[in-house]
Amino acid sequence: PSTAEIIKGAEKFNMPVIDIGNGDFYQIGYGKQGRCIEAAITSETRCVAVDISCDKLITKKLLDIQNLPVARGQKVSNVLDLLRAADEIGYPVVLKPQFGSKGKGVFVDIRSKKELVKTYDYLKNQFKDIIIEKYHEGDDFRVCIVNNEVVAVSKRIPPFIIGDGLKNIEQLVEEINSAEN
């Protein structure tokens, strides 16, 4: 769940919510009962869990060790590695940063070498570590687990824009992105 959803839930139960970090960091409750949150991370979340959740390769390895299905893929360091991995995995593929969240920098359903190299060149200017994986069509779900219990599941809907006949695409994207913060 997003920070906004957690805050709505707290307010629904008349719990005090204090913005202590420019809309990114909140305290819910007062005194010793108060809890801090940033996105879905709380003051109860262990540091190692946060580190794991931000590193897609470690997350994938841990899921694989538990015999959960993961997409075939690897970290790539240059165009030669990239093309070799794509041939081995098979198209379509996904390119994404190793570290990050909220789907930022993730490009899906890449179907050609030309598109792959173009996307890689774009990503390598923004991110140091890049992963290529096999693309599997289907829905994307986020699961929030608290105290070993699933408390929320959300379906991610890919971003899209509906024009208003007045603004250009860049203006519409900026408007939507600023509204999310």
Language model: regions and residue ranges:
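Low-complexity, highly charged intrinsically disordered N-terminal segments
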Residues: 1-22, 41
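Short, ordered loop/turn segments at secondary-structure junctions
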Residues: 22-23, 98
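Short polybasic amphipathic segments
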Residues: 24-29
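Active-site nucleotide/adenylate-binding loops and adjacent lid/helix of ATP-dependent enzymes
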Residues: 35-181
